[in-house]
Amino acid sequence: MVIEQQITGAIIAGIKELYGADVTASQVQLQKTKKEFKGHLTLVVFPFLRMSKKSPEQTAQEIGEYLLRNEPAVAEFNVIKGFLNLTVACSCWIDLLNSINEQPAYGIIPVTEQSPLVMIEYSSPNTNKPLHLGHVRNNLLGYSLSKIMKANGNQIVKTNIVNDRGIHICKSMLAWQKWGNGATPESTGKKGDHLIGDFYVLFSNKLKEETHALEAKGLTKEEAEAQSTLMAEAREMLRKWEAGDKEVRALWEMMNNWVYAGFNETYKMMGVDFDKIYYESQTYLEGKGKVMEGLEKGIFYRREDGSVWADLTKDGLDEKLLLRADGTSVYMTQDIGTAKLRFDDYPINKMIYVVGNEQNYHFQVLSILLDKLGFEFGKGLVHFSYGMVELPEGKMKSREGTVVDADDLMAEMISTAREISQELGKLNEMTPEEAENIARIVGLGSLKYFILKVDPRKNMTFNPKESIDFNGNTGPFIQYTYARIRSVLRKAAEQGIALPEQLPLTFAISEKEENLIQMIADYAEIVKEAGKLYSPACVANYIYDLVKEYNQFYHDFSILREENPELKNFRLVLSANVAKIVKSGMDLLGIEVPERM
């Protein structure tokens, strides 16, 4: 904050004048004053005692008196046990608000051609099922992180790796071939990803029937699966796919295209997008090539059964399979190839993988393998590891068909938002189109905010009912407050009030108003902190605190009915800047805010 920098400079000058000592800004510990004490900023004086050779209280008193004489930003001070509490002059707060008011994109660092390039991978779906609740948290975190990193002055490439090949894909293909009767998205009226997901579940159920019958004959579960003709057919289909069989490839392409059309609808509704999409089918051969190079160089080794492994025991890990005995690849193989292609395609300064914490070990291994293969970027990979998300009912499983689909969840959220908004009268005097748009904005905002306000590293339970409350730490509470401020500003415009670009520094404001300005000013630091910690939750909870503080101000003070024109203008400018920061912060979370509600 500018005021802190100004006072820090004065403290440095004061230490020099009072004690003849040179100190740097990093030695000046200036922090927000605790609520139970009077003041805005508190200086910790203990680091200066060896310079002053006096008690903490006396040192604080002398520095306070110096600031009062020499720094106009300091209006008064008090000393509590060696802590110097400073009250900032009223004119400084108004001046700070003027400065923020001049900046439409306050807190956002502009991106230039020289800015570092950050690539962020998120989503990573399989083409054998629709996106589910787990993908929702992944997509929302990845998209929000991309906006936060851009706001910190980075060029951004949002990327997705689609797992479009492998045995799990062949299971859906085989089920469609055997029992699909030529079903298409058009003939069934289903989204393509949902249709293919149905066949994945069907395969799982048919496999259970077959293995249970074999187990009834006395076979163990493992023996039954090994003798399963269905699994044998699926493996044969995968072998044919890898061999480039035309019929298998044509079926694969047709079914994957159905899925992509479905995914695109889901991404559009969710409000997330990508700059570059990679497909495992296009990267796994690159990975296999790199593994074979590593084998030739003695970095990896081959076992008797023909499989290729990496021995990472000297790195404190175990042995890692890279190619199966039949020559087929594993996820690690593909990730090696994808990483290589990405760094060939872009001058990446930082590569961030948004992937759940169950893959912590995987990315630890990937980083070491890339380093062993001689890729400098290996050590710099960032795994943005996040916790699992569940519904109150418990975990999700896709093989049994009991998974919570992203499409169904979003539709349910919008429907609930519509009902609650109607009950509360928030859709009155709106056209059906406007009302539907508000239901969409509030429903999706509820979902996004509830997920993003949680520390990404923690497991969480998504509670739809709690998320859509218009009170408390929720998206609708923030959205409604924004709409309320916009309503006040519209009424001011209707009364012919033009907001001044600069407020005079000659009138007094309350402590609550000073605190609100301080909170607005904090936004720039919050954006930096969110980028440093890779945490949208920093932004979400800051915006909630700001909105909560504004609502208290709105309750306690008149705005349009204020008789003093200077104070009225000040409160309107203050409100406008709260709205500006709320909109900016919610945008970093990928959440829309309505102009009216």
Where are these regions (language model features)?
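Non-catalytic interaction-recognition regions
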Residues: 1-94, 112-597
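Flexible, low-complexity linker/hinge segments
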Residues: 101-113
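Short, charged, solvent-exposed linker or helix-capping segments at domain edges/interfaces
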Residues: 95-100
